[in-house]
């Protein structure tokens, strides 16, 4: 059975392992190196594990094993209000297709509502149709495509 729950200190090793996998996977995709930048599992976990702040780290379990994670933050919108932003959602390859990602996204929606967010954003890298389709299945709609040109 799949389950999403808030991450606890005992999950740190699993979260570090999952973030290492997520960073490698993202960096290998088109546009991924710009997204990943100099992020490491340590720097990301430091940012996402401050109790009381407008950020939440959840883990996804399957049969009692942590196989996925999701980080969501409440960010202020220019016109007022808050948006829940999915900063990371990753499920181990072998555990995909059993509902862990869906459970994590639903937990992010619940957390965002509790923080007063009125909408949510999530990123999908160019060409990452699997992520785009999963997000659309969870009720997200594409609304903006950002293109970039390096000036060096």
Mark where each language-model region is.
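Conserved active-site alpha-helix within GNAT-family acetyltransferase domains
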Residues: 102, 114, 126-144
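Conserved GNAT-fold acetyl-CoA-binding loop/helix
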Residues: 20-46
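Conserved acetyl-CoA pyrophosphate-binding loop and the N-cap/start of the following alpha-helix
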Residues: 95, 99-107
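Conserved GNAT acetyl-CoA-binding A-motif
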Residues: 112-124
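Conserved beta-strand-loop-alpha-helix junction that forms the acyl-donor binding cleft
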Residues: 93-96, 121-131, 148-150
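Conserved beta-strand in the GNAT
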Residues: 57-59, 65-74, 85, 90
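Conserved N-terminal entry element of GNAT/NAT acetyltransferase domains
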Residues: 1-13, 17, 21, 30
